[in-house]
Structure formats: C-alpha cells, structure tokens
Curated annotation (Swiss-Prot):
UniProt PPR repeat ranges: 41-71, 72-106, 108-142, 143-173, 174-208, 209-239, 240-274, 275-305, 306-340, 341-371, 377-407
A Gene Ontology cellular-component term: mitochondrion
UniProt organism field: Arabidopsis thaliana (Mouse-ear cress)
Superkingdom per UniProt: Eukaryota
Coiled-coil region: none
Official protein name in the record: Pentatricopeptide repeat-containing protein At2g20540
InterPro entries on file: E_motif (IPR046848), Pentatricopeptide_rpt (IPR002885), PPR_At4g14850-like_plant (IPR046960), TPR-like_helical_dom_sf (IPR011990)
Gene: PCMP-E78
Annotated NCBIfam families: PPR
Repeat is among the record's keywords: yes
Pfam families: E_motif (PF20431), PPR (PF01535), PPR_2 (PF13041)
UniProt xrefs under PANTHER family: PENTATRICOPEPTIDE REPEAT-CONTAINING PROTEIN
Amino acid sequence: MAFHGIREVENYFIPFLQRVKSRNEWKKINASIIIHGLSQSSFMVTKMVDFCDKIEDMDYATRLFNQVSNPNVFLYNSIIRAYTHNSLYCDVIRIYKQLLRKSFELPDRFTFPFMFKSCASLGSCYLGKQVHGHLCKFGPRFHVVTENALIDMYMKFDDLVDAHKVFDEMYERDVISWNSLLSGYARLGQMKKAKGLFHLMLDKTIVSWTAMISGYTGIGCYVEAMDFFREMQLAGIEPDEISLISVLPSCAQLGSLELGKWIHLYAERRGFLKQTGVCNALIEMYSKCGVISQAIQLFGQMEGKDVISWSTMISGYAYHGNAHGAIETFNEMQRAKVKPNGITFLGLLSACSHVGMWQEGLRYFDMMRQDYQIEPKIEHYGCLIDVLARAGKLERAVEITKTMPMKPDSKIWGSLLSSCRTPGNLDVALVAMDHLVELEPEDMGNYVLLANIYADLGKWEDVSRLRKMIRNENMKKTPGGSLIEVNNIVQEFVSGDNSKPFWTEISIVLQLFTSHQDQDVITNNNALAFIGIV
C-alpha cells in the first residue's frame, strides 16, 4: 500500500492499535510500524507506550521510548503516566529530569499530577516542593486536576498548612478538592477542622461521609462515627464497602450488635461479602460483641482468606479466652501457606496469656523472631511478660523487662504489679510501683493494687499510708461506665453523670432494681481492699 506522508501512515495504524487484544497481534503490528519507519514518531510511540502500560510490559515501553531521539511532551507524559501506573516512581523522577535537561519542551498540566503522585509515593517532600516550584515557574498553575494532586501530595506528607494554602488559592474547586482536604484532616485525626470543612461542603459524596466516619473511628470517637453513618443514610447515600469497613470497628468497640447484624445483612444483599476486608471487619465485630460462633461461621464461609482474616480470627478466639481455638487456627494458617505477621503472634500470645500457657507463649515468641524474622514490638513483650506473670514466673518476667530493647510501658509494669499478690513478691511490686508513679502519677488504680498487696500481707500501716496519700493528692478513680443499645442507638452511662434526659425517671427505676438485690455484708478488713476501698 502506498502512503502519502508520515501522517497518513500513522492514521493507517491507529485503528489496528485500538483493536489489538493479544501480545502476538501487538508484536506483528509493532514490526509493521518499525518497517514503515515510524520508530521516531512521537505520536506512534506514544500510542505504543500506552498499550505497553495496559499490558504492564514496561521493559518494552522503555525500549520504545529510548529509541526516539527527540520525544515530544506527549510522549514524555505517556511514559511518565505508564511508570506511575506501574509504581515505578524512581523511573518517573528520572524521566522528568531528562525532560527538563534534554528536551526543548516544558512539562505541562498533564505532567504534574503524575509527578506529585510519584513524589508522595516516594515519601520525598523535598522533591515534591521542587516540582511544585516548577509548576509555579513553567506550568498552568491554576488547573483543578493539578492542584487536587498537589493537595493530595501535601496531605500525604502530613503538611496541613501547605495543603490548605493550595486549597485557599484555587480559582476553581471541585468535589475532589474538598474530599482531598477533608480526607487528609480526618486521616490525621484533626476532626474539628474536618467537621468544619464537611459542613461547608455543598456536594457531600460517599467519600466525604466515609472520611468522617473513618476519622472518628481512628481517634476512638465511636459514637460520633456511628452518628455520621446514620446521618449518611438519612441523607440518601447508600453505604459502600469502604464505609462499612470504616464503621464496623465502632460497632465492635461499643458492642452495637444490632447495627453490626444489619450491616452483615446489607453487605450480603449488596454482594459485599465477596470483599475480604468487609468479612474481616465483620469477624472482628462479632468477636468483640460476644458472638464468637457467628465469627467462626463467617470465617469458615470465606474464600480467599488473607493474613488479616487469619489474625482476626485468632484474636477473636483470644478475646474469648479460647487458646486452643487460637492455636488450631494458627496451625490451619500454616497449612494454608499464609505467612503470619506481628498481629498474628500478638493474638497467639494474648490467647496464651488468658489461660496461663506460658511455655507455649515462649515458643510462639521465639518462633516469631527466629522462623519469621518479625521484630517484637512493645505489645509483644507486654503479652509475654503478662503470660509469665500470670503463671507465677515473676523472676523470668522481670528479667525480660531488663533485657527488652525498649523501655517497658505502664501496661507492663501494671501487669507485674497485679501479679505480686502472693507472698514474697513485695520487692517486685515496689519496683513496678516506682515506675508506675513515674509514668502514671495520677492513676489511682495503681495505688489500689499496691494497697491490696499490703492488705494481703497484713501491712495495715502501709494501707493507711496509701489512703492518706490518695486523699492528700486529691486522686480520683476513673468513673465506671456501661453501654446499652436500644433501637440501634448506643447509650453510655457513666457513674455520677446526671446529664441524661429523663435522668430522674431512670434513677427511680434503678432504685427499684437495687432495692430487690441482696446486700453484701463486708465482714473483715481484707474485703475493703478487694473492692477498691482504701
């Protein structure tokens, strides 16, 4: 076939490139393109690089690009985009530097979004700010897609100031602009600012609502997370799998079983149970809400279990004190060739701790380090020390506190203190208490624990001294509380709090309940210590 000019040849091959489906077809077309002398055509090579991106053959894309003597900005953008899609961020930076150094062309509005994403993925704030400077110098500064990518980059660097500055200076904002800023604030736990921004938004999408739910869950404000979940539904927005995964931990922490069951049915109806993340969150919710049988059933029905699935089930067994269930699940995990992680071993150690299986605890701790090269964190040391202390192996537990690579925290010293109620362990108790006074000077519970130990030993002068210290320091116990779920709404009641609506009526009902309960009679001094009265 005779062609008149390079453009006609290019136009001839474009439909073939658009229809190609297999690598064999692609190779034949590519050979024809080279035969017709188009290896230097930036236009044709751009199309070929785009196809390489689609089939994830970046080695060939690189060879095609390198053959072109003078690539234009469209070809540069194509190879930068392809490298970004395939997570080759260092190559993105290399090509960008080549564009600045060797090309007569400048980066444009299609270049910068991929550059900002690559800098963020590399975690290089320095590079990101340099590219931002290039945008101000070369690029069309006020372009919403570019500025959205810039906001997202700064948010990933936890740079709220620069992110908000870009947002404030935008000529035009779209819903992605708002959601990028909102999601960043929520991810960093800045929920007051996130809420203010949320209420300014005219177009709230599922992404906006999910960011708020996830943000509140992340900082432990579980009631607020569930409130936003309900408000989202009242606003007519149906939850997706991400919003379900975001709210289920709040259900788990608050014991909101009814809402959790509703989410399970909703997820089943919408086909979300095919998503491993949704099933993992449901297993955790059922475990923490006390319905371990439902968690086991759901786990058994899952396909494609990942390490989180196995670890969540192991932790569920541990939460219910079923060490044998946790160990058997771990054995199944090994047979399934799924590599455990630190969370897996934390669940195993916790399970061993609940039932005093200290030898198994030591074995799993050693297995974690030696077989899987997982460096124990302070939580792992805490569980190991707890299992040894509960089993009466205090000397070994104390030895670990001296040799562990990080300073023991208050949980570790508290675990040691609470295990010192047998005779002969007063010295360990006093050492633990010294550290607790330093770490938690106002925690009355630690003084109560020590007073219990003194009471067990008949050291009533020391009990009296501690009682005087508590009064002089004006220490107060953290008030007890309880949660109750009615009509899918969780209500929290805290000791001494009379701010609830209908508090008078509630008090009358509570008095009726207590009047029918048997009154326990305290018959000896030791009982005073056991119920926390010092």
